[in-house]
Amino acid sequence: MFERNQKTIFVLDHTRYFSIASEEYISMDFLKGKPSGDGGATGAAGNATGSGGSQFSKSLWTCACESSIEYCRVVWDLFPGKKHVRFIVSDTAAHIVNTWSPSTQNMSHVMNAMVMVGVPSRNVPTSSDYSVIHGLRAAIEALAEPTDEQLAAMADLGTDELPRIPNKGRVICITSARDNTSMKSLEDIFNTVLVQQNTLAAPPAKKGLVIDHCHLVILNIVPLGVESLVTNRSLLKISPLLDVEIHTVSAPDISYKLTHLILNHYDLASTTVTNIPMKEEQNANSSANYDVEILHSRRAHSITCGPDFSLPTSIKQGATYETVTLKWCTPRGCGSAHLQPCLGQFLVTPVDVTSRPSSCLINFLLNGRSVLLEMPRKTGSKATSHMLSARGGEIFVHSLCITRSCMDEAPSITDGPGGRVSDYRTAELGQLIKMSRMVPLKVKDPSAPPLTRRLPRYFPLTTSSSILFHLQRHISWLPHFLHLLVKEDMDKQDEVRCQQHIHELYKSASRGDVLPFTHTNGARLKLSKAKDQYRLLYRELEQLIQLNATTMHHKNLLESLQSLRAAYGDAPLKSEPGASLLRSFTESPLSPERLEPISSVGASGSSNSNSLLKASKRRMSSCGQRSLLDIISSAERSQSNKRLDFSGRLCTPLGQVAKLYPEFGTKDKDAVTTGASITPNVKEESVRS
């Protein structure tokens, strides 16, 4: 509730230095049309044309007052009655401009007090009594004073044993220092006074609230074009009670700096409404497009954007922060069915409240009109993401839902990413969930099967992905047959029934009966296609039995089915049982056919000339075929058999390690030995000579 931005205190340096000009000259020659140059001309330009008295420059004090008052205006517009801002002017002493009382937390009171303070006099002699330290001491004392909300919370607590009220705050000091040493001295004095104030607030004195934490922001301002010896510094933790950051900025840019800081201080975002059609002031028959920058809560963008949208951001000239660019959307009539739901509404305030585009937009909204704003999608199209409207004299930005909202109907399960799917086995899935319901037991049963045995091992999600479960709607005995296959306690009688059904399938295949598929539209299939369907049916049936083969009766059924497949000419390849079981678990029944070994293809080619055609038609992988690793391994072995093996491996006895380069080093030894035998002869010949 009591956050760090609950209390903000501005300490304004009112010493003699702040009476000098900011060196940003503003033209006053309005009778000759628009000024030819930018209003923020340099000092040299001002001196060149300033002899006619058509330009003037604000003082450092005026720049500091205007920017700080704009800061508190934004705070009070967006957080009326919730966030508090105080002002303290420091020269020979600390002058309190306003208090935490709601009666002084308004623009009129602050501006009237600033008028009474006035610009610092240049005729005041330089003295050590003029210092900003007086204002910093008063700011710490002001942080210890409770606000009305804190007083109400203290009254609700009642006793001292309850947790004390959190008390955090921020002090923004606008001053001008000579160098980093002066800044370091200012930090040390502030930290010392902060510790002393907490000592006074602790029992038994209890003079005010204990300050839990303080954030000190020092703005060192200088005239335009003057270099400062004070370096910028990001947020630094001085002590457990104090964090300090330092910014050096020219006087004309202090408003941009405070706007940048307020975004982080109050979690705000900047939005620029572009392409606002507006009548020209001098020519009512023509119109031009203007831009207006507004501030609001950052959540206005975060709750709207989805993965398909990206915020278009830009940096305003002279500023250092990013602003989101949204385009003015021409209102178009639409019924209530086309209105987008609102995710949230947030107060809005313009950055430059005195500009003509801002005032026109504010009056347009206060007259009861609404403005729709567009943001681009990643695909290139646009979507209406926000709406500006006014109620009760306050302007709000509404975040519209541009993605699927919770009020929309749930997406249909038939709208899959691969197209429209309409044959999900929804009813069977519900039955499976009921059968798989688990309940906790007070005493563990040692004879109970493990949990992995109770989990479903094979369940096609769609009817079109399974031949076996597709036919159960058209063959009367097939549902009961499938129920018997997955029984954990299959007995001999169930095995006999299943054997009879398997033999019926074999007889139907022998007679050439066509399986009753709905997609055949009653047309009789070719014999080769009917055989392929029976082969697919046998393979899926074998996969289902193998996954549920937990009893001896299941294993007998599996052997019987494999023998029938062999008699039908579709015998499975011999492979390792572990690999086949793994493939049964991990593969879909309609996955593509694997490549078969060259030897098996050659053997089957003599018996069936259409084996390649049938293999291309097969859409199911059986448990006895090879994996990708087997295919790659066999290909590597076939290539290695064509090359002669390493001679060292061939000559080395089994169990020993082959020596690489066995003659390596032998020639060098022979050369050394030969050289040693030749050297004495050479010496003898030289002695003789």
UniProtKB/Swiss-Prot annotation:
For the motif Nuclear localization signal (NLS), give the residue ranges.
613-619
Has UniProt tagged this entry with the keyword Cell cycle? yes
Cellular component per GO, a single term:
nucleus
Q: Where is the composition biased (Low complexity)?
A: 599-614
Q: Modified after translation how?
A: Phosphorylated.
**Superkingdom as given in the UniProt entry:** Eukaryota
The UniProt entry, under PANTHER family, shows:
INTEGRATOR COMPLEX SUBUNIT 13, SARCOMA ANTIGEN NY-SAR-95-RELATED
Stated name of the protein: Protein asunder
Taxonomic source organism? Drosophila simulans
